[in-house]
């Protein structure tokens, strides 16, 4: 009997997960539940339901009706809503942590307090505030700060001094604005190069993916407003060109400690994807944040590199047997680039047709688009991602860039992601910081 698997979520990340599942030698039958029809996911599915991914009862109802045997939750919102808990309660194993553990992403204040309680390395000096006067005083005291809303913001709520906040006055004003909606985390600003480390987790064991570097700024040269991520790259191997092996080993230890501490704190094993966003400083890797799911775009870099059967990995995650399964990756470099609507992220042009031409050797992943009468149109978010995979970053970048040149529509993208000049800038920056 072929296994019936349900995928929850409808973005570019979920398109990559769907592809990973469908490549399995076990020929699983894939079902999807997504808020909007993703044409890439729909094409890989036996059947799908268009429904809000946070409607817990509807998710369980659909899973039972389709006799689902295992589920994968892609985005953070359904995890925060307790979708994984409800599916487990219905006897359906899930890749995606229960709410008690997913809190590490959806409550930034909880996450920092948890790190402090368990002595998890890489935690900045920070405080959590609900009132203006002490928050403003703490900003004055620290001087160089990052200001974060405590809840989920789709990766766009954090503002940092020297970047989006030109001075202390701006930091105070932004803090006051956020405090109207809820608690605010104010922490020391780290200076360095960011990287993402993701892992499959079975409650105890972690299987790490190669490190990825994402590019949050909208425009070339790392300028402009923050976005959900304009593109990312991996090198052939597990570290990035500006890293040394010791950096990734330290980051792995932090994530392992986090998983062990989560079990102790919550009484529940963390089963799913743990995403560590790190910043590599002169004092080693520090934790920017943890997420309870794959990154988007980072998922599209790493999923195509998995050589071990994806469904077997999912099964091991749900059974706690990841330690018995060697998870292998091909030693190739990848470059992912997003084509986004003109005006994104502040004033995106929606309902504009997207025509995907000859993309050559690249992979294409549909994100926030919709299909109407056989044509594909933009919404207000990132539209289509392309991924080049090759022996070197430079070669992978060319594959991705050539594919983008053959996608038509009122779109733009960053040509500089994965290029030698931008990577050299990162290497030089780290050399300077390390002295």
Swiss-Prot record:
Signal peptide: none annotated. Pathway: Purine metabolism; IMP biosynthesis via de novo pathway; N(1)-(5-phospho-D-ribosyl)glycinamide from 5-phospho-alpha-D-ribose 1-diphosphate: step 2/2. Keywords: ATP-binding, Ligase, Magnesium, Manganese, Metal-binding, Nucleotide-binding, Purine biosynthesis. Binds 2 magnesium or manganese ions per subunit. Mg(2+) 2 binds at residues 289, 291. One of its GO terms (molecular function) is metal ion binding. Residues 112-319 form the ATP-grasp domain. The keyword DNA damage does not apply. SMART domains: GARS_A, GARS_C. Its cofactor is Mg(2+); Mn(2+). GO terms for biological process: 'de novo' IMP biosynthetic process; purine nucleobase biosynthetic process. The keyword Nucleotide-binding applies. Its EC number is 6.3.4.13. ATP binds at residues 139-196. PANTHER family: PHOSPHORIBOSYLAMINE--GLYCINE LIGASE, PHOSPHORIBOSYLAMINE--GLYCINE LIGASE, CHLOROPLASTIC. This is Phosphoribosylamine--glycine ligase.
């Amino acid at each position: 009997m072929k296994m019936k698997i349900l995928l929850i979520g409808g973005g570019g990340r979920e398109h990559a997960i769907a592809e990973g599942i469908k490549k399995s030698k076990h020929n699983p039958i894939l079902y999807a539940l997504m808020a909007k029809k993703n044409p890439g996911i729909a094409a890989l599915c036996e059947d799908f339901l268009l429904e809000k991914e946070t409607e817990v009862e509807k998710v369980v109802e659909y899973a039972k009706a389709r006799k689902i045997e295992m589920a994968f939750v892609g985005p953070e919102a359904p995890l925060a809503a307790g979708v994984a808990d409800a599916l487990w309660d219905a006897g359906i194993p899930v890749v995606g942590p229960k709410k008690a553990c997913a809190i590490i992403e959806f409550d930034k204040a909880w996450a920092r307090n948890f790190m402090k309680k368990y002595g998890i390395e890489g935690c900045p000096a920070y405080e959590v505030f609900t009132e203006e006067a002490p928050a403003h005083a703490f900003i004055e005291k620290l001087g160089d700060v990052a200001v974060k809303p405590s809840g989920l913001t789709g990766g766009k709520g954090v503002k940092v001094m020297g970047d989006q906040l030109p001075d202390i006055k701006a930091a105070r004003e932004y803090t006051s604005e956020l405090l109207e909606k809820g608690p605010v985390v104010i922490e020391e600003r780290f200076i360095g190069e960011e990287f993402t480390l993701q892992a499959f987790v079975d409650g105890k064991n972690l299987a790490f993916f190669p490190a990825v570097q994402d590019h949050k700024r909208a425009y070339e040269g790392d300028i402009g407003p923050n976005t959900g991520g304009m593109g990312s790259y991996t090198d052939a191997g597990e570290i990035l060109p500006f890293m040394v092996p010791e950096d990734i080993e330290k980051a792995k230890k932090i994530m392992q400690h986090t998983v062990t501490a989560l079990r102790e704190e919550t009484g529940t094993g963390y089963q799913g994807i743990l995403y560590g966003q790190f910043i590599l400083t002169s004092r080693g890797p520090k934790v920017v944040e943890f997420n309870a799911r794959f990154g988007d775009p980072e998922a599209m870099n790493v999923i195509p590199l998995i050589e071990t059967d994806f469904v077997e990995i999912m099964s091991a995650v749900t059974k706690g047997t990841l330690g018995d399964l060697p998870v292998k990756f091909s030693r190739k470099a990848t470059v992912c680039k997003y084509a986004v609507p003109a005006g994104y992220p502040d004033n995106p042009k929606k309902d504009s047709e997207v025509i995907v031409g000859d993309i050559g050797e690249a992979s294409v992943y549909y994100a926030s688009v919709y299909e109407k009468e056989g044509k594909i149109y933009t919404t207000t978010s990132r539209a289509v991602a392309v991924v080049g995979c090759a022996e070197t970053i430079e070669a992978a970048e060319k594959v991705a860039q050539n594919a983008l040149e053959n996608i038509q529509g009122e779109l733009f993208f960053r040509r500089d992601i994965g290029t030698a000049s931008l990577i050299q800038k990162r290497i030089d920056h780290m050399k300077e910081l390390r002295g």
